[in-house]
Amino acid sequence: MNYETKRLHLKRLHLFEVEDLAICPDWIRDRVTAMIVVVHRWLGVPRIVADQLGLILADMDGEAFTIIDVCSGNGGPLPEALELMLAEQCLDRRVKLLLTDLRPPSGGVARFNKNKNKGKIASSIQYFERSLNACAPLMEQLGTTPNGACDSLVRDGSLVVRTLVCGFHHLAPEQASLVLLDAQKSRQPLVIFELTDGTVPPRWLWWVTLPPNFLYGLLVSLFTWPVTIRELVFSFLVPIIPACFAWDGAVTSARTYREAEFYDLIQTLPASEDYQWEFKTVPGAVVQHSLIIGRPV
């Protein structure tokens, strides 16, 4: 399929985010990603993601599905989205969720995996304990461990749907193309969701959101539990955590791929007649969200 590209006045800015840096302490990264879970909940992201995944699963033949999420952080909106799907859309199907990350949070891994035998929702969620690079072949990484997650998926007969929620903007164009290519080669659906479509604020004004983001970070910190004494100290007495939250949130819009830039990435992939890509925007509570869907045809 051919896609027409459009040129932008100001291209995407690949600024750094604190949580991406190898020198970022794990406890700061884990706290910031836990705060992001709260933000997703407030903005209604689990509902949006559940609706979109439900539409994709409805078009697929099969009785069992596994959603493999990359760049999961502390879980993001997927666990709550899965709960909505199981309650409303997929009662006649088995749906599981496998969370993965380059730097799996120890607290998140323990929280999800220790509850695997507690209730229908908890038993449907697992966090892959080893580092997983979203830019490398996904199924190969899952199958490299003894009794790996990939092997269990094959034995289970599950159809795989990939997701990347609020993580695509972390990838440079070369990395982003690898994620798209692996999904296309594997002929597995891929759903990419971003909190913004990259148009608000204008890219050259990305920095104006730093002060309100900092105040917002203080507010979000109050509702992010559980919390340690150290996290409280560095949230309110020495507010390093809200500062990191503010910076990462401000540069997200500047890093987010706009529609034309996404289709530029598609142009780098081998032509395929049996896999299609779609970019669309979804109305949000504050700004428009962007949604990228790849699927076999």
What are these regions (language model features)?
Residues 171-186:
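A short, conserved alpha-helix within the catalytic core of class I
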Residues 1-69, 74-76:
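Class I SAM-dependent methyltransferase Rossmann-like catalytic core
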Residues 203-266, 272, 278:
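C-terminal alpha-helical "lid/dimerization" subdomain adjacent to the S-adenosyl-L-methionine
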Residues 267-297:
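C-terminal lobe and adjacent flexible extensions of AdoMet/dcAdoMet transferase-like proteins
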Residues 183-200:
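Conserved beta-strand signature within the Rossmann-like core of class I S-adenosyl-L-methionine
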Residues 167:
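Hydrophobic adenine-recognition pocket in adenosine-nucleotide-binding enzymes
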Residues 65-143, 148:
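Class I SAM-dependent methyltransferase SAM/SAH-binding core
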